[in-house]
């Protein structure tokens, strides 16, 4: 089905049934697939990997390494990949707050991905999505607004590359 992933509506509609109930034994395979899709050359296959990995946030298969893998795509030139990364981190904040919160910082400008942080454009999108969420407590929203106020405004924040 990967060749048919040609736009964001298709990738966002995928909802793996193996995340629920007795099919949870399939989660390790799903995790491996997602991580593989995220390094694919195709934009919407990368997005699919991020979106489906999001479904593992509330399962025993969640790993902090998933945050690192998704963050590796945060500097993508592809708008739809960056939006998926922002969405993932906003969702991670609601389901895995302790693991996700350190990533709500500006990435080291040296380009190293060893320490938590996201590029400004992606971080601004993630913060905005989290602030707009009804599942994020008001106190945390105030912290996020403070983070957003320190971020540089970028003319490319609304630009779509394809």
Label each residue range with its predicted role.
Residues 1-162:
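Alpha-helical scaffold domains
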């Amino acid at each position: 089905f990967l060749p048919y992933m040609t736009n964001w509506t298709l990738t966002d509609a995928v909802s793996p049934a193996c995340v629920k109930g007795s099919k949870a034994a399939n989660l390790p395979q799903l995790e491996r697939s997602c991580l593989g899709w995220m390094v694919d050359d195709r934009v919407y296959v990368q997005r699919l990997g991020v979106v489906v990995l999001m479904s593992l946030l509330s399962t025993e298969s969640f790993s902090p390494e998933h945050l690192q893998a998704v963050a590796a795509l945060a500097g993508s030139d592809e708008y739809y990949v960056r939006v998926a990364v922002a969405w993932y981190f906003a969702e991670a904040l609601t389901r895995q707050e302790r693991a996700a919160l350190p990533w709500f910082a500006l990435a080291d400008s040296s380009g190293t991905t060893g320490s938590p942080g996201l590029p400004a454009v992606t971080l601004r999108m993630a913060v905005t999505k989290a602030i707009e969420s009804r599942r994020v407590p008001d106190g945390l929203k105030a912290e996020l607004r403070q983070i957003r106020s320190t971020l540089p405004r970028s003319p490319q924040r609304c630009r779509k590359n394809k």
